[in-house]
């Protein structure tokens, strides 16, 4: 007979190769057909809610690796929560207003000057919806489970209406005001910017030291001195109205040749060196506070420069005398306001100097630096000119430098509720913990929030003006505008006259003739997304405010985390979130930022097309995402190898359970052998460890625990020795059914544990598992760890066995290299262990030659009794020899019982018995 036909080899139709790029889209179609999102929500209905609120990505272009990292992390959490006793809805969102969309249309050749604002905005909306559709399909391809048919989109009328309500609530509480104040201004975007829209890049600037002659010394100075200021923005000098000194600093009057200069005493040496002074001597010192109200002359205009006191003056750089232009700096503005200076800002929206800067009008601010410096030299006021490279704020979208410029803007007064903001930060759980300090410091130090933008594509600021110029924001007007937006969308603001946007019959004492005009500015996009707690969490029945978790990149401390906190605390007095989790950025394999110029951009689509979504997801689980993370072909190759091991483990388990019926063949735990129960202890340890890691969002710990379990506990040990029983014994042999019982528990638990990370693969495995009834593994719960009564004793004993086994494996490896044996089944081993290990070995009832995968096993004496040439290891000496006998044709064990059964001459006694009992009729 053909003995190979009597072996119970693994049998399964579960494919060895993942072929994920083809198989995953088919799985996603299946999910769509069965409405998996709705099914999970139905299955978890009535459980406590866990709400992870999606920070809306910007709807422009394909998704990048940062998007993929973010959405996959969120998906891990939502999937895990829905399998551990929660109802975890996930509503995706998109941020759809703002400059990039306007620019995209301009780049496509849209002639916006030839159309009305309303017409241009319609094109913006169409473009935004196209981008949403494009990104939605890409996110779905990642395997992200979400309410994709009902996302929130910031341009939708219902959303905009709620945003107007948030604005109205803040205005009613007195938190919204209009004021002239220096704001970050982008000449290239022709709009104000919020702090969140700024990034710092290196820039080369002129660095100049300028002398301002004293005009009136107020009996403190003699009048022949000169203040020295230092600046890197010569173009702001036409706007200079003063000089700030620190009240507590000591200032020196320094005589250099025939000139006398005023600088901070502690900067004397630095300034003297920079200006190359020789024989300079300090002739007098005065306290900064004494210099208040002295007057200097502007270097090239017939104008005074008032000396004022300011706490913002430092001795980190410069001279301790600070050039002050209230129209071009926040500190300058504050000091100037205190001293009653006008807010002079001789620069227009495009960054061009106006006639308020005589001699330089019509010049772009950056181009004005040179002629201004030349003018200073001409009048003898320029003491030094060099060039420096320093970190300077740039527009995050156009990548061009920005300026500080005083304009009339709408602000949200943070000062009015800063204390509540700081309390809300303290009450929130931050992961990583440094997030709390970061946001606390930002909130503590931030100025009022400039919320107006001079653009077309955004939510209008719902303010009307009376004939006398008074702004009008009342409950009545806000509610009416919100209703109009809900019905028609915010475009109605640009399609109708002010009177048609006001409630019928509306009157105001400031408009005796019934004439009104409307605000033309729109809101900062951070106000859009920052209102999502109201427009989404509060408005949708399936969600709740505060959310349990906000999870975004670390750039969102100054962005969405901040704006959401500001609007939520302003409106509700509380944070919109209970917890905040942040992740780092995705870098290339060498730790460099991805950029087109380097050509190192890794695109999610390419990874999914070549390797599959589950490989990308497994990579996300493998990295320490709280810091910046790296990705490259080599890194992905390693991850794909780990995936292959996990997949092969599933295939092996399924293959060996082909004839296992859980309802009929399961062996009771009490009847399992010790080694099988030990495997269950290891499985329960895995379940506990993995669930704890999911709970603390430590996905790398999940990844490593599952990988180690598959390779070390299963492949290298349990599955390795189990083959001799699974393949060789008869189908119903008690040891075989015992091992299958363990394998079945392992398979079901492992499939569930990997589901949040590898949903495609888990749902591919699921229907192959004998006896499962659920349509998808996503409709099940995480496995529960079952504590065996003798778990600790089993662990102590069998962990010791595993360390001893390592010694045996080393000895077998040496014997193989020395050609004593071929494979381990050729071996006969004799062990000479330590006393402790000897006792342990004697207490094992299992067949030790099976556990060591050798043909013969003997226990010799103690370690010290071992032959002198026997290699000694930590726990035992091992003598390895060639086993005596012949090799069994069926089980490959070397045995002296071969041919004892005349009917089966090439089989060992054990195999002959198995064949007779199971295969001979």
Curated annotation (Swiss-Prot):
UniProt binding sites for L-isoleucyl-5'-AMP: 552
Sites where the protein binds Zn(2+): 888, 891, 908, 911
Cofactor-binding details, from the entry: Binds 1 zinc ion per subunit.
Any single GO CC term annotated in Swiss-Prot or TrEMBL for this entry: cytosol
GO BP field: isoleucyl-tRNA aminoacylation
CDD domains assigned to the protein according to its UniProt record, in alphabetical order: Anticodon_Ia_Ile_BEm, IleRS_core
EC class of the enzyme, as a word: ligase
Catalytic activity: tRNA(Ile) + L-isoleucine + ATP = L-isoleucyl-tRNA(Ile) + AMP + diphosphate
Keyword entries, A-Z: Aminoacyl-tRNA synthetase, ATP-binding, Cytoplasm, Ligase, Metal-binding, Nucleotide-binding, Protein biosynthesis, Zinc
EC number: 6.1.1.5
Recorded GO MF terms: aminoacyl-tRNA deacylase activity; ATP binding; isoleucine-tRNA ligase activity; tRNA binding; zinc ion binding
Chain ranges for the short sequence motif 'KMSKS' region as given in the UniProt record: 593-597
Cofactor: Zn(2+)
Source domain of life: Bacteria
Residues that hold ATP according to the record: 596
Motif 'HIGH' region: where in chain: 57-67
Gene3D superfamilies attached to this UniProt entry: 1.10.730.20, HUPs, Ile-tRNA synthetase CP2 domain-like, Valyl/Leucyl/Isoleucyl-tRNA synthetase, editing domain
Compartments in which it is found: Cytoplasm
Entry domain remark: IleRS has two distinct active sites: one for aminoacylation and one for editing. The misactivated valine is translocated from the active site to the editing site, which sterically excludes the correctly activated isoleucine. The single editing site contains two valyl binding pockets, one specific for each substrate (Val-AMP or Val-tRNA(Ile)).
HAMAP family: Ile_tRNA_synth_type1 (MF_02002)
Quaternary structure and interacting proteins, as annotated: Monomer.
Function per UniProt: Catalyzes the attachment of isoleucine to tRNA(Ile). As IleRS can inadvertently accommodate and process structurally similar amino acids such as valine, to avoid such errors it has two additional distinct tRNA(Ile)-dependent editing activities. One activity is designated as 'pretransfer' editing and involves the hydrolysis of activated Val-AMP. The other activity is designated 'posttransfer' editing and involves deacylation of mischarged Val-tRNA(Ile).
Family statement: Belongs to the class-I aminoacyl-tRNA synthetase family. IleS type 1 subfamily.
Protein name as catalogued: Isoleucine--tRNA ligase
Organism: Bacillus cereus (strain AH820)
Upper classification of the organism: Bacteria, Bacillati, Bacillota, Bacilli, Bacillales
